[in-house]
């Protein structure tokens, strides 16, 4: 799962991060705590069960920083 991060250095590859879930009327979104990065929106079928993940990549692009996490599900 990919998250958008606004500033560099808030998480590192290999770090275990806590995730919180937000609910919209027809989808869910996830935040790396404490409000470090936010995911896009996911449908019910894509909903995460895990609340901890491991950072496997941090990529800098012209649009910002993108954090990729893996979850044991």
Which role fits each region the language model picked out?
Residues 24-36:
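Short, Lys/Arg- and Gly-enriched loop/turn segments at beta-strand edges
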Residues 58-64:
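Short, conserved beta-turn/loop elements at beta-strand boundaries and strand-helix junctions
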Residues 14-17:
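Loop/turn positions that initiate beta-strands
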Residues 1-7:
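Short alpha-helix capping/helix-loop boundary micro-motifs
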Residues 64-73:
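Short solvent-exposed strand/turn elements
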Residues 42-52:
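Short coil-to-beta-strand transition motifs
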């Amino acid at each position: 799962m990919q998250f958008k991060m606004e500033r560099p250095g808030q998480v590192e590859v290999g770090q275990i991060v806590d995730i919180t879930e937000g609910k919209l009327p027809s989808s869910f979104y996830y935040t790396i705590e404490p409000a470090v990065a936010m995911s896009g929106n996911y449908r019910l079928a894509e909903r995460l069960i895990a609340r901890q993940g491991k950072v496997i990549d941090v990529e800098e692009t012209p649009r910002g920083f993108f954090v990729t996490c893996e979850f044991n599900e």
